[in-house]
Amino acid sequence: MAACGEPGRPWQEEEAAAVVVVGSCMTDLVSLTSRLPKTGETIHGHEFFIGFGGKGANQCVQAARLGAKAAIVCKVGNDSFGNDYIENLKQNHISTEFTYQTRDAATGTASIIVNNEGQNIIVIVAGANLFLNSEDLKKAASVISRAKVMICQLEISPAASLEALTMARRSGVKTLFNPAPAMADLDPQFYTLSSIFCCNESEAEILTGHAVSDPTTAGKAAMILLERGCQVVVITLGASGCVILSQAEPVPKHIPTEAVKAVDTTGAGDSFVGALAFYLAYYPNLSLEEMLKRSNFIAAVSVQATGTQSSYPYKKDLPLALF
């Protein structure tokens, strides 16, 4: 595996990316309102903005802002949103060598409504993301095989995510799988191909059929997921932190986080995943528990500002103790 140097050092395109994401790019269309509308109701919002999102790109951007050499394998439309997105990735120092454009679909979009408490409802139209295919992945095999960590989600086709995970595992690359948006009938291979299986409470509910509302119920859901073949299961619980369970230590452990005033929780889970990937790649000797504590902290910073990627902190904005 190619050496990846020090986090945060400017890097050349020929250097191997330590964190590789195979996933989605979405243009966020965000409306801020005092409260969320009811069915059939029209309400006034007080602000609108267009931002950059998509679980894959979000996770990649957070890892890059912490100092990771990062690359993304994704597909956007051959349109203004797609062109703007490629420029956004470059500005975040993310390799776009395998960022493809297609004329067959528009760049993916996410329509987001956020209330005064920072709660949100989201509708995504995946668009070009679903056109990322096996041929695209094969072209990107060199960057996937040389990574230290590869992240996948489910905003691209499940078949593409499964193929990417298979490629990574075959090359000895650590895999971090975020099963979002969750599917009740998830292919069993996703569990066995994931070095770390990381989901939130609502995703854990869909996957297991059991209610998840606190660390205790999260631990029970994690046990079910572990029994399906995962090596490590992490269930995030928002303001309550997260729960971890592993084959090596099959007793659920709750890792709390600091209480903060949330302004906008959109993308907080992606901030957590991106931070975790950064620590897995650059601080492999840290305990997983410590990595999760630090990832909790970074995600908590992100909820204190509006927007998705716009809320993600840079290394320079964070305490030195995290590095």
UniProtKB/Swiss-Prot annotation:
Record note on cofactor: Requires a divalent cation, most likely magnesium in vivo, as an electrophilic catalyst to aid phosphoryl group transfer. It is the chelate of the metal and the nucleotide that is the actual substrate.
Classification via SUPFAM superfamilies: Ribokinase-like
Documented activity regulation: Activated by a monovalent cation that binds near, but not in, the active site. The most likely occupant of the site in vivo is potassium. Ion binding induces a conformational change that may alter substrate affinity. Competitively inhibited by phosphonoacetic acid, etidronate, 2-carboxethylphosphonic acid, N-(phosphonomethyl)glycine, N-(phosphonomethyl)iminodiacetic acid and clodronate.
Alphabetic keyword roster: ATP-binding, Carbohydrate metabolism, Cytoplasm, Kinase, Magnesium, Metal-binding, Nucleotide-binding, Nucleus, Potassium, Transferase
Broad EC category: transferase
Reactions catalysed, as given in the entry: D-ribose + ATP = D-ribose 5-phosphate + ADP + H(+)
Gene Ontology molecular function: ATP binding; identical protein binding; metal ion binding; ribokinase activity
The protein's required cofactors: Mg(2+)
E.C. number: 2.7.1.15
Locations listed in the record: Cytoplasm; Nucleus
Binding-site positions, K(+): D264, T266, S302, A305, G307, S311
Subunit structure: Homodimer.
Biological role: Catalyzes the phosphorylation of ribose at O-5 in a reaction requiring ATP and magnesium. The resulting D-ribose-5-phosphate can then be used either for sythesis of nucleotides, histidine, and tryptophan, or as a component of the pentose phosphate pathway.
Active site: D270 (proton acceptor)
Binding site for substrate: M26, T27, D28, G54, K55, G56, A57, N58, E155, D270
Gene (name only): Rbks
Gene Ontology process terms (BP): D-ribose catabolic process; pentose-phosphate shunt
Family: Belongs to the carbohydrate kinase PfkB family. Ribokinase subfamily.
UniProt pathway annotation: Carbohydrate metabolism; D-ribose degradation; D-ribose 5-phosphate from beta-D-ribopyranose: step 2/2
Presence of keyword Glycosyltransferase: no
CC per GO annotation: cytosol; nucleus
Protein name, UniProt field: Ribokinase
InterPro entries: Carboh/pur_kinase_PfkB_CS, PfkB_dom, Ribo/fructo_kinase, Ribokinase, Ribokinase-like
